[in-house]
Amino acid sequence: MSVENPIDQTDLTFFTNEEGHSLLSRFKSTLKDTQLFDALVGYFRASGFYQLYDALEPVEKIRILVGLSIDRDSYDMMQYHQELGMIDYESHQRTKKKYQGNLKEEIENSDENDNRLEIGIRKFIEFLKADCQDPVIDKAFNGNGKKLEIRAYPSKNIHAKVYIGKFKPEDRDYGFVITGSSNFSESGFVANREFNVELRSKRDVLFAENQFNTL
C-alpha cells in the first residue's frame, strides 16, 4: 500500500536525487561560498569528482577521509595483500599515490565513451598538487599546505557519509552538514535514489567539525 502526502517542493533540507532535489545541485549552490570542505565517505570515485570539481574550484581547503569497506581478511586473499595490508595506517603521501593509481585504473576499465573520468582524474591530481590559497586556515587544521588532502581512515568499520562545509567569516551562516546515504560518486550525487539531510545550525556544524578533526 502506498500513501503519498503532499510535500513542499521548495524544501532545501532533504535531498533524494529526485528531480529538483539532487545532492549535486545543492553542493553547487552552497560550495561557492564555502572556505573549508570536508568529506568522510565509504568510498571515493572519479565520477563524483568530475561532477563536483567546478564547484570545488573556489574552495580554499578540501579534506577527504575515505573508509575502505573491504576488511583485512579479504585483503589476505588478494595477491597484492602486502601492499594493501598497510592501508589503514597510510600517510597522506602513500594514500595520495594509491588513489591516483586507483583512479587511473577506473578510467582504463570504464565503459564510458566520453572523457568525464579522464577530466575527473586530471582535476583530482591537479587539486592534490595545488597549494592551499590560505596558509592560515591550512595551518589551523594541521594541513599539508595543499588545496586537497586525502587519507584512508584508520579503521575497517567506517560507513559514514558526511559532508561538512565552513563558510567564509563574512557569511551570515557558519556552515552546513549534509549526512545520509550518498557516497562521493556520480551515483551518490545524481543517479541513485538517496536520502540525505542538511543541518545548518552552528552547533551541529561545530559538532561534526570536531568529530572530523579527531580522526
Predicted regions and their residues:
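PLD/PLD-like phosphodiesterase catalytic module centered on the HKD motif
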Residues: 1-215
